Amino acid sequence: PDERFFQLLAQLACQSIPPHRIILMNTERAYWDAAGAEGRLETIGISERCEIHHLSKAEFDHGGTRNAGVLFSETPYFVMMTQDAVPCDDKLLERLLFPLVNGKAEMSYGRQVASPDADILEKFTRRYNYGDQSFLKTEADKEKLGIKTYFASNVCAAYVRARFDALGGFPPRAIFNEDMIYAARLLQSGGTLAYCADARVYHSHCYTPAQQFHRNFDLAVSQAEHPEIFANLKSEAEGIRMVRRTARFLKRQGEGREIPRLFALSAAKYFGYALGKHYRLLPKWLRARCTMNRSYWEKCA
């Protein structure tokens, strides 16, 4: 837990609809203790609502750990957030839950806004992927939106518990992308997904080309492991479209010097994705070099 995590908890404490319980799935207790987290929860005034479950890094799984967290709850609606997503205002939970409570959707996800200190590439990426207009998505949108139909991030997302349980939750074993896999199953079963542009969190990264390579390798592995969802959906065209729009944006902003870095990051994404799609052809040692989640492959041994 870092300072952003404690900012997140402080913001949750003052929401217009405050959470009844906050279930924290913490990886490695030593980090929790070293950060003095118990004392910080007391200072924020939220400790009585927090329930902490510690696990080792080897035990963590993108799908299984989240499923375990849900099992600790008994609410008809629940919200999932990562530790680095900070609410922009006190209306996040209210706006995220609105389409669920009103029967418009069975899952919703919020808008990710780049942190003020994010670089220009990351700021454009967040604006590109998270627009300022809310909308609903169903399986019928696949012809128009392609793979973007299933795009949904549980960096900040809300779920109808009954539907979540009926669909079996997240895949119990997932290297990455468990949120999109669940969203696809929801839409394929006749459900509706809501994007809530007014439910905003600060969330951004500044990845190096190497980090983007690892991330996209794992993304592609997740898609290759679920051909029932992704076999006939292509990501490459959407990726090329985004690179072109980003390059044009940089030119308009007089930031042409950032274009080489854009191309370096994009190349890393592409090669990571290409290798991940064919991970079954790679020896185990090479998979371990390409992934950002080595413990996942150790469990596969």
Label every PLM stretch briefly.
Residues E139-Y159, I175:
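A recurrent flexible, glycine/aromatic-enriched loop bordering the glycosyltransferase active site
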